[in-house]
Amino acid sequence: PQAALRVCIETRACNERERFHVDHVALRLICTYRGQGTQWLPAHVIETSSGGGGSDAVPASMLQEIPGGAIAVMKGRRYPDQPDSGLVHRSPMAGVDSPRILAMVDIDFA
């Protein structure tokens, strides 16, 4: 199978927290170079909460974070042979005076 790649380096400055979601890609490699890392939830938390994303009503003790500088590989909705098994995650708040700097590589299979 062929793979399509999309490489992106961006800054994010938002005073509102993103909602939990799963990316519409097969795989995403992500690294936060500046600011707080991407927040994610273990699968067992999703199964007992509102059904796979979109809700922020989860116990703070269940929230996990990818450390800044770490490279993470996250499954998305289009991961082959395992649809809808992607990692539920969100970007944390980042103020205009302290934006996050992210590098992402999205991989999709044709």
Regions found by a protein language model. Give the residues of each.
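Signature of the catalytic double-stranded beta-helix
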Residues: 1-9
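A residue-level signal for beta-strand positions that form part of recognition/binding surfaces
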Residues: 6, 29, 100-102
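A short linear-motif detector with a strong N-terminal bias
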Residues: 8-12, 18-19, 50-53, 79-86
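Short, structured patches in soluble enzyme cores that scaffold and shape functional sites
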Residues: 9-13, 31-34, 42, 76-78, ...
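Catalytic core of non-heme Fe(II) oxygenases with the double-stranded beta-helix
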Residues: 14-70
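Catalytic core of Fe(II)/2-oxoglutarate
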Residues: 57-110
